[in-house]
């Protein structure tokens, strides 16, 4: 009985999942935390710098795979036919001529610029804005039109340009740059050299300005005009061809076969971003909006090519042929913070308890237990009295805004407070804010002629916090399907591995047998939906007003009168 393994590289940990290909049964799973990341190494949150050491990925992946394989019988281990990989993104790293991430070399071992630049690293805001301006020059090709019209600081070229400008040693040593979701399959298959490495359609199309209509990447002249420093250090084009994730990049290398105790015949499928594979694991069909909810959200929608036609959807994070399911257009959107907003509020409320624990060491364990109950208690308190009449209006931009219209300069805003606002009400305002952000994304599609036939949610928050999900359901004012599996991203990676290994002919056939089921479907409550509608309109008004205060300084000075007028809304 064929078994596929999915690897899901998240922000904090990597998950390995073994799945029986015939039934979709989840046989074994393991989660390994990144040790250096957990200690806060190589990060500077105050300056929005978040880096992952490649050894965190390698060590945690090996431990997770060995743990899963140890849970299988000898017969089952012999039945492993493929390994699939998904990761956060855009999370690129500089590599040398052999495809080694520079931080694996002694001279760069502790240099954050030689590591993977995590998706939520926002150090490249100015570089991203420069790319957007260049794309929009009159009379020139707009290379941003298939990625929503705005290039983000979270993406490939902005990060490359920022590091290249900042660190000449890394710039000199880098032969290329590679996304994490492409590098791990190459590592497992022994194909890391830039000329051998297969670039995934998903990462290239959504984050690297790659599109078939202009022959791949933008021309060298585009990068020269952006900043000649890129072409001075990197050979153009960095790559030309891309592959969908169902195409194998190779088989398990002799080194990794020995380390894992598996056959070298195990197929290694192409890589893609976590949420794209999560949508596949959830069994998503065309025009279903799939919300992968965690610290942030990634929203995925696939559409038939003919229905999309020549239309380009503005304000999203890209529309790419084959980025999710081959032969369909994959569209990506998302919220830069979701669960992170609740965690922030928990830290705010927990600060006095931390001080008390320092003063009273004997009470430390009791206080720690109380801290863990803060958010569940707030959720319950607001659910028991979900009054919306005096609910604070909050803008969910605590980590910038990804969609609609990416802008990482934005900050969170809390309005409509009074002396009667208590902790449950403020927490309710945060819940509503994340739901409003979800609706803004849905409307970004529907208002541009892309139908949303149904909405699905997956992830830990989706399954474990019905209060938050019901608020989303009421704000969206449509049914909300909760997907059963907690491991849809890893499951999606396993589905791609099964197709790469030849167990199934294509992704839809594999989904029929392996994808997760819908656990429950929430229905909107008409009265709450009507009340939320009024708050959503206020959320939109504040969004227009507040955004004026986070314009780049030059533009802000130019538009100051407009900013003041906006505040009178």
Swiss-Prot record:
Q: Which reaction does it catalyse?
A: D-ribulose + ATP = D-ribulose 5-phosphate + ADP + H(+); L-ribulose + ATP = L-ribulose 5-phosphate + ADP + H(+)
Output the Gene Ontology cellular-component terms. Answer: cytoplasm
Q: What class of enzyme is it?
A: transferase
Q: What is its EC number?
A: 2.7.1.16
Q: Name one Pfam family in it.
A: FGGY_C
**A GO molecular-function term, please?**
D-ribulokinase activity
- Under which pathway is this protein filed? Carbohydrate degradation; L-arabinose degradation via L-ribulose; D-xylulose 5-phosphate from L-arabinose (bacterial route): step 2/3
- Gene Ontology BP annotations: L-arabinose catabolic process to xylulose 5-phosphate
Arranged from A to Z, the UniProt key words for this protein are: Arabinose catabolism, ATP-binding, Carbohydrate metabolism, Kinase, Nucleotide-binding, Transferase
NCBIfam families in the record, alphabetically? L-ribulokinase, PRK04123.1
Q: What's the family? A: Belongs to the ribulokinase family.
Under what name is this protein listed?
Ribulokinase
According to its UniProt entry, this protein's organism is: Klebsiella pneumoniae subsp. pneumoniae (strain ATCC 700721 / MGH 78578)
